[in-house]
Amino acid sequence: LVGSGLMDAGTANFFELLGASAPAPVEPPSVAALYVEADGVYANLPGVEVYDRQRDARRYRGPHPVVAHPPCSRWGRYAEYHPMVGDIGVLGDDDGCFAHALWAVRSFGGVLEHPKESQAWAWFGLMPPLTGGWQRADDFGGYTCCIEQCHYGHAARKPTWLYAAKVELPSLPWGRGKQRLHEGYLAKHGYEKARRAGIVAMAGGKDKVRIREATPEPLRDLLISIARTGAREEAA
C-alpha cells in the first residue's frame, strides 16, 4: 500500500512499467504535537502529527504520545492585570487547553512545556521543580524539571518548566545559561536597563514576540525524542 510504508515488489514493478519512480513510503505518525502553529517548527516532520488552532488540539484523543505547548498567557505573571494595559483576563481562562494537555500527557505519555513560574502548576496540584533534575510532580506518575532554552539556541535564557509522564527521562543541561545583553543598549544605558529590557526586545524589533515565543529546533527535537520513548514503552 502506497503511503502506508507497506509496498510490495509487485507495486514497485507497476511504477517501473509506467516509467515513474515509486513514491517514498510515508512514515506513520508516532507523536502528536499539540497547540502548535500549522506552519511552525513542527510542520512537515516525519512521524509528527500537528494539531494547531484550526484543528483544535483539545479534540485529540490519542493514541500517540504527545508534545504539548498549551497557551500560557492566562497562567503567567500578567494573566489578569498588566501595569501598562490594566485588566486583561482571568487567571486560568484558557478554554481548557492546559487541562487537556495535562490529560493527554498522563494518558498517552509525552511531555508538556510551559514558562517557569506558570501558575498552572499550582492550579493543577503539580509540585514545581526546585532544583536541577527531574522531580516527582504528582501522584499520577508525572515528573517535572526546569530548563533554560538558551541551551538549545534561544536568544534569551527563557527558563521553562517541563512535565512528563510515561516516558524515559533524559539528563539535560541544568542550571542558568549565560546572560546575553544588547551591546549597544548596554553601552548607552548601562547594565540595569539593558538587563530589564532583555536581548529579544532590543534585537528582535517588530518580530520580538515571535522570536520570544518560538521553540528552537534543537529543543523541538529533544521534546519529540522524549515523547517517542513513550511510544517504545507502549510497544514493548
Residue ranges of model-derived segments:
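Extreme N-terminal basic, low-complexity initiation segments
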Residues: 2-7
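Class I S-adenosyl-L-methionine
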Residues: 8-10, 14-236
